[in-house]
Amino acid sequence: AETTEKSMVRALFLRQGGQGWTVSLLYQFPEAAADASDAEAEIRACTAEGETLERAIQTAEQALPKTANYRLCEYLLFDEAASQTELLEVQEFLQTKPVNRLSARAFLVEQTAPLQQQAEPLLQCAEDHAAGAPHLYEAAGEMILPVVRLEEETAALSKESRLLTAQGSTPLSLEETAMAQLLQEKLPVSFELEESTITLRRCVVSVEAEGDGFAVALTGQRKAGTPPVSEVQCRQLEALCTQTLARCWENGLDLLHLGAVRALKQGSGEKLTTKNAYPAVRVSVEMLEF
């Protein structure tokens, strides 16, 4: 492949503080192949600050060895303390700029090591777990963001996540994160139950309006070569599902779109939103054998 004469930006790391924005461009130069997003070249980081997001990006671009090219930029990384407001500001800015990466996957980063030393592991971690991360264009709604831990020796995906809504940023536990992934059909997913690990490779999630509440049915299938899921574990999954749905609802996220299900059944009338009290939800879990 030809060697590009551009600095190929692979990811943006964006942090907002009291004095404005700090932007780090994770880029490849000059060995990056012009036609491949998996080009082999050292990943470097170029960091700059600015009173505005635009100014911070411009300053960082000026410090690159060659003109910035965002064609292969697929990841947007935010500080772990980021809010939905920050994501929306970034989304609005990128709509009108050459960066224009609204389809980029969004992650939060918990940083305890200098970015310059860990730029390559950070990008690799984002690439490895991209399928479980939302796109930036989804920021207009509530979203659950995966968290990457950037440490001295490595970058690794946390088993916990954060829920970003207009109400704020809410941490989700390991168990709640796994259940949220299951309900969003991001599979396979594993749970630690009854001192054993179960891994579901498939799960059908169905939701029906039932009286004044809802019935949620999870029909799953375990990964081949793993122990059968017991009745006790099914009941634990039911309780965890109920807990996760309620926690998300109370913090502004209707994870299973219960409001839309209600609207389809009753037609006109008062809409059910997360501003209402959490409705009654009956959860059932069943496992299919091979």
What are these regions (language model features)?
Residues 1-290:
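Membrane-proximal alpha-helical signals and transmembrane carboxylates
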